[in-house]
Structure formats: structure tokens, C-alpha cells
Amino acid sequence: MKILFTASEAWPLVKTGGLGDVAHGLTHALRERRHDVRLLLPAHPDAVAGLEGRIRRHALTLDQRPFTLIEGRLPGTRVTTWLLDDPPLFARAGNPYTTEDGDPWPDNARRYHRLSRVAAALAAGELLPWQAAVLHAHDWQTALAPFLLQRRPVPRPATVFTIHNLAYRGLFPAETHTRLGLPPEAWTPEGLEFHGRLAFIKGGLAYADAITTVSPTYAREIQTPAFGCGLDGLLRHRSGVLHGIVNGIDTTVWNPAADPHLAACYRKPDPAARAANRAALAQRIGLDGDTGERSGPLLGFVGRLVEQKGVDLILAALPRLLAGGARLALLGSGERELEEALRQAARHYPGRVGVHIGYDEGLAHLIEGGCDLFLMPSRFEPCGLNQLYSLRYGTPPVVTATGGLADTVMDVDTDPTAGNGFHLPAANAGALAATVERATAHWRRPAAWKRIQARGMGGDYSWDASAEAYLRLYRNTPGNNGS
């Protein structure tokens, strides 16, 4: 089957979050199943520098505007990758979405309209001698591609749109609709208009042949006012084509048995390896070593420092957590207020709280392999990947039972035979502290703790099941000729 993926990022070329992991992992899994999957990304400088394989350049024109498609291979895979090289739009260093001050690039609407426009034309076979059976677009940055393809005469490629996080909707002033040359008839509440603004994400939600999101629970949640971000009515209307498919992870990259970032690798729960990794992590991030029997668990967090992730709950619960003997290792970046609050916590609790602002792949692996518990007190979580890394590394996660966290983490006390982590009863600081205390009681019983770790490490978190689910969806999507 010929499948065109389009996204704004893909690891290891460009990555700011889980979307980058999915764009890499799912395309790789489909290609390994001998499907002709291609990937279209913006030609950010890091992506151009990282492209592998034989590099070809296709000089093309669309809508009377010249551009180049740089063709190569996604590193570590056999996935043919095209980079949309339009220098005024994408030849910018740093974050692909925001300026150095953290503000969205002022021309983001024009940038991602162009990406969607090229994706639609490429999928339809208008640019190169290759045509897709399915166009699979991801998040608001490419959501106009299904809308643009839907307007074409049949036969046309089937369209699938994946919501990775509904909170990011791609909202722009009303005049953007006209400025981009979008058809007037699409400016309706049933079309691209959203409370007087243009919503890129509605190009996928309202017009794609099939919609997916990254867990069954999140697919149900976004059809409610509490999680629907004002789009729950549209999603209920389209519930017949809305599917929840849990993400996988790259089990070769996230493999505790052969992880070059760990001080000691391990294939099963191994207290000695955990102790070695804990010591390496403590030294790396500036924590005191273990302090004997009164020492509590080492808690870890890796993620974006935003309200969604519950970082403020960790800060509020910190005095109680530390009073119980715990230490905290935290890696992330995001909102400046939270970054500064965490720096202050590290200064206030030297040796007990270690904070690294930014992203460091090696440190992320060491946190997974060196901590005793991993904290994910998210207010909502479409899928989550860190809990899967944690389970694979034998680091039981403490999570809010929402979205993909509810689908992948089973509470030890609710289900003693299958439990692999711990659920917060509510997303607040008191619940977080109480749940960590409950988990700590299990942690202090080594034999029982090893059984909990083993259940987590024994799960299958690869892309295999997810890839098969997507293939079934592609085959059953109207308009797909199976080519």
C-alpha cells in the first residue's frame, strides 16, 4: 500500500514532543511490513543536515511558487523522506514553531498552509510520478491537507487525520482565511470557522475520511465538554469515523538491556543495576546519594513544563514528598514561570531536588533507568510515551487515570495480578503525595516490588499492534483503492 505521512516533525530530524516519536516509529513499522510509506516534513536546517541515504533534489512549482523537495531517508529506517525546502518559510534555526522569546512565528498560518498544500498535491500524484492510496496527516500543522484533498474529484487518496493533542488547534484571525485563498464556502461553523477564527485542526476533524487519536480513552474524552476544547460537538457528530489507537515506542532505542546511556544494563528487575543507575543519575543531576534505611524512593519526571503535565502539582506536593524521604530528578522545559519555580526548588532543597532545564536524551534514559518511580500527574494525556518507557525500564509510573495513561497503566492495588503502576484518585497535590506514599509502601517490600517491575517490563510496547491497527483502518477507509 502507498501511504504518505505528513507531519511537522519526526525524530531524529526534528523533535519537540511525542509527535516526532510517532512520525518516526509508525512509518518505520509500516515500512518494515513492506508498505511503500513516504514522509513529508518541512526542511528545517537540522532536518536537512540529518537526512540520510542518497540525496536527490526535485525542483518543482505549485501555485506559481517554486520550491524544492529534498529526498533522502529517515535515519535508522528505510522510509523515503521528502523535505519541503522553501527557505523563506522553513530555513530557521531553533524551535520549529516559536521564536526565541517563545512566541509563535507570525507567519505560521502561511507556513503550515504551504505544507498542507504540498502534501495534498504530492498525495494526488501532481508533483512526482508517485501517488498515495492514503494520506495520513498529523495535528493542526498538516490538518488542511485532508480538507484540500476532499475538494478534489474522485478517485482521490483516502485521508486519515490523527489528533495528538486537541488543545493545539491552530487558531488564527478570521482574515487569515481569505489571505490564504481558502474557499469562502468553507467559512462556516461546520467548516473551518471556530468562534470567529480560522481553526486549522478543523480541516482534519471535519473533512478527513477517518480520524484517529492516540488512545481509546482519549477518543472518548474529547467527545465531552471537559476535554473537547470546544470541538466536542463536531467530534460527537463524527464519532462513527473516530478511532483510538495507542502509540507504540521504539523498543530498540528504549531497551534497558542495551542502553548506552545507562551505567548498568539489565533484562529483568535487578536491584544492583538500579542502584548503579541511581548513583550515576544522582551524580549527573546533583542529588545526594542514598542515605540508608530512612532514604525514600527517587522520583523522576521528564516532559514539557506546562500546566497540562501537572508540574505545578509536583511543586505543591514537594514538601510532603521530601518529608517522606524522597528525592526528585526532573528534566524538561516549557513555561518560564514553572522553569523558575523548579530552579528555586532545587536551590531550596539542595541535594534533594535535581533539575535540568532543557532536553538531554541521555539524561532522559538515565532517569528512566535510575529512578524508582516516575511521576505523570497529567490533567489530561492523549497517549503519553514516558509511562511506556518507564514500564519497559521497570520504573512503575504514578499517573492520573486519564487518556492513554488509563489505557496502559493498571493500578497495583485495584488489580493486584496485573497492576504495573499507581493511579491518582484526582489531579491535585494531595492526591499525588498520597499516591506516592502508597507506592512507597510497596517499594519498601523488595520481593513484591520486583513482581510489579516484572509485570511492567513484560509488556509489549512496540509498534507492532499499533501498526496493524492502522493498516486495518487504511484498508477500510472509504476511497482507498489499496494500491
UniProtKB/Swiss-Prot annotation:
**Cited Gene3D superfamilies:** Glycogen Phosphorylase B
Q: Which CDD domains match?
A: GT5_Glycogen_synthase_DULL1-like (cd03791)
Q: What class of enzyme is it?
A: transferase
Q: State the source organism's domain of life.
A: Bacteria
The record's annotation in InterPro entries points to: Glyco_trans_1, GS/SS, Starch_synth_cat_dom
State the reactions this protein catalyses.
[(1->4)-alpha-D-glucosyl](n) + ADP-alpha-D-glucose = [(1->4)-alpha-D-glucosyl](n+1) + ADP + H(+)
Its biological function? Synthesizes alpha-1,4-glucan chains using ADP-glucose.
Give the protein name, as stated in the record: Glycogen synthase
Q: Which organism is it from?
A: Alkalilimnicola ehrlichii (strain ATCC BAA-1101 / DSM 17681 / MLHE-1)
